[in-house]
Amino acid sequence: MTTIILSLSTALSYALQDYLMMPVARAASVIAGVLWIRVVAVLAVAAVAAIIGDLPSGGEEWRAAGFAALGGVFEVAAFLAWLTALSRGQLSVVSPLGSISSAFTVVFVLIIGQSVSSAVWVALPLAVVGGALTSFEPADDGSRSRSAAAGTGWAVLAAAVFGVVTILFGEASALAPITVALFAGLATVLATVPLAVALRAWRLPARFRGRVGACGLMDAGALIAFAAATAIGPLPVVGIIVAQTGTMAVLLGMVLLGERPSRTQMLGIVLTLSAVTLLGTVS
């Protein structure tokens, strides 16, 4: 039961972050959103790490810290692409596409020559077909032609980069999850600050500061909850439940934002989320 509660908390936290960040991404700087979410999250993670974390010791652990930091740098690109997707598209459409980062992780694992479960060979085609159906919407003039739905390209790009982040974090497994999060978060902030200063994009409108601060705290909480869930296990249960982030985001978009994807897109959403759930069973 503890694993289920922690995993559900993680999924709900990420879905709520997507919902809360949509108006920020549309009205303010995407870079400022990434910067301040990560600053708040890193401060929260650092506070927890000061109590239960340990600094790396020895060559293997410092090598792992390097991979964690590199993952943090890639996270900057992933978050920028993701917030751009949220600024342009419907939550119920882009969120399932963002969830297919696990499919990209599998592809990268295959590229480097590692073996995968047979279930993956079912999930990957589902993810491709589901992603394609979700990404296109009917033309406004009522004709049979279709065009790419707003934000879907950015969502797929974010998923691909998050897939790389997962691989890099996997290489940092010699460290405790909270330590990985700390080094990744510090690298994210260090990479984002110069970008924000160079583009003069660090200012966040006052009306969004509470929202972004809450998202930063939820981001840290989700990370800690996920780390605890994976430590308790079993991992397939954690993977399946956390994979429902996309499902929760779809429901939030349809219920709270009044979004209405087309029938074809709904079919794509179902296929995509099914693929993500299947991939969760082999996590």
Residue ranges of predicted features:
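Hydrophobic transmembrane alpha-helices of multi-pass small-molecule transport proteins
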Residues: I100, F104-V109, A119-P138, T264-S283
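Transmembrane alpha-helical core positions of polytopic small-molecule transporters
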Residues: Y14-A15, A41, F67, G71-F79, ...
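Membrane-interface interhelical linkers
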Residues: M1-S13, L20-A68, F79-G89, P138-G153, ...
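Hydrophobic/aromatic residues within transmembrane alpha-helices
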Residues: V24, G33, A85, I111-V116, ...
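C-terminal transmembrane-helix exit sites in multi-pass transporters
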Residues: W82-T84, A103-V122, L195-R200, T247-M266
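Hydrophobic alpha-helical transmembrane segments in multi-pass integral membrane proteins
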Residues: A44-P56, T105-V120, A160-I178, D219-P236, ...
